[in-house]
Amino acid sequence: MSRYFVAGSHTDVGKTFVSCQLIRAERAAGRSATAFKPVLSGFDPDRAEASDAGQLLEALGEPVTSTRLDRISPLRFIAPLAPPSAARLEGVVLTRDRLLTLSNAWLSRTDADLNLLEGAGGVMSPIAEDATNLDLMTGLGLPVILVGGSYLGAISHTLTALEVLRTRSLTIAAVVVSQSADPEAPDFAETVELTRQHAGGVPIFAAPRNGHAAWASALTEALAARRRLRTSAA
């Protein structure tokens, strides 16, 4: 069993896209997977299937029902704003302790081979009134899968996020460079290679938007190999 926090170097870089691809690859290999996103903003109840929670359920092969949405993403807010701002509009005060309690409760009952806990926004985005995603990650202490983009400026955002994670002594399991949708974005392969050159030896995986998800299979196999090593060493 392995557990990872899926973080973003920026907002909308493709965290859920990456999580879904990893879930599909893990299941295709005959292993179990599950996911949890404690807080979600920009949620449209009439289009629940298109939400991050709905996409995660689809990747898990589960129907998008109210009960399952509550299980995978218990705090869902309508406004497309930072979670504490969206929550405030609905009369809810989001706190770090509440998110930690929800996350730890999920971690205590999940036993899949691959367990992904996904943040909201970028590493330094506010996720509660008194916490950023970084604070939540620090409180949980999970190894991190960092998702970066390929838009102009993405390399700087990704490398900055890596440095910030290191200041909290968080383990960085991998960086996934998710291809940005912007057709005018810099060359994807070059962005991946430049990120690799400056990432300090962290494993880098390239995730094209419309290509074969071989990267996801490679990453899930690497994570499975780590699990086997930990088990044999125990």
Swiss-Prot record:
- Which SUPFAM superfamilies does this chain map to? P-loop containing nucleoside triphosphate hydrolases (SSF52540)
Please indicate if the UniProt record lists Ligase as a keyword.
yes
Q: Which residues bind substrate?
A: S41
Name the cofactor(s) required for activity, per the record: Mg(2+)
GO terms, biological process: biotin biosynthetic process
Principal EC category: ligase
Q: Which reaction does it catalyse?
A: (7R,8S)-7,8-diammoniononanoate + CO2 + ATP = (4R,5S)-dethiobiotin + ADP + phosphate + 3 H(+)
Q: Which UniProt keywords apply?
A: ATP-binding, Biotin biosynthesis, Cytoplasm, Ligase, Magnesium, Metal-binding, Nucleotide-binding
Q: In which broad location class does this protein mainly occur, judging by the first location in its UniProt entry? A: cytoplasm
Q: Name one GO cellular component term.
A: cytosol
Q: Which residues bind ATP?
A: D12, V13, G14, K15, T16, F17, D52, E118, G119, A120, G121, S178, Q179
EC number(s)?
6.3.3.3
Compartments, record wording: Cytoplasm
Positions of the catalytic residues: K37
Q: Would you identify the family this protein belongs to, as annotated?
A: Belongs to the dethiobiotin synthetase family.
- Function recorded in the entry: Catalyzes a mechanistically unusual reaction, the ATP-dependent insertion of CO2 between the N7 and N8 nitrogen atoms of 7,8-diaminopelargonic acid (DAPA, also called 7,8-diammoniononanoate) to form a ureido ring.
For this entry, the protein name equals ATP-dependent dethiobiotin synthetase BioD
Query: Source organism lineage?
Result: Bacteria, Pseudomonadati, Pseudomonadota, Alphaproteobacteria, Caulobacterales
